[in-house]
From Swiss-Prot:
Identification of the protein by name: Cycloamanide E proprotein
Propeptide positions: 1-10, 18-34
Taxonomic lineage of the native organism: Eukaryota, Fungi, Dikarya, Basidiomycota, Agaricomycotina
Residues joined by cross-link Cyclopeptide (Ser-Pro): 11-17
GO MF: toxin activity
Family: Belongs to the MSDIN fungal toxin family.
Record note on modification: Processed by the macrocyclase-peptidase enzyme POPB to yield a cyclic decapeptide. POPB first removes 10 residues from the N-terminus. Conformational trapping of the remaining peptide forces the enzyme to release this intermediate rather than proceed to macrocyclization. The enzyme rebinds the remaining peptide in a different conformation and catalyzes macrocyclization of the N-terminal 7 residues.
The keyword Cell division is assigned to this record: no
């Protein structure tokens, strides 16, 4: 999951894949997966 989001937004969600992944999931799909 983290790799998918990292591939989408490497500029913003790369330094913190876990936390950013969680936020990205919540904002985009509405589900937090860390």
């Amino acid at each position: 999951m983290s790799d998918i989001n990292a591939a989408r937004l490497p500029s913003f969600f790369f330094p913190v894949p876990c936390i950013s992944d969680d936020i990205e999931m919540v904002l985009t799909r509405g589900e937090s997966l860390c």
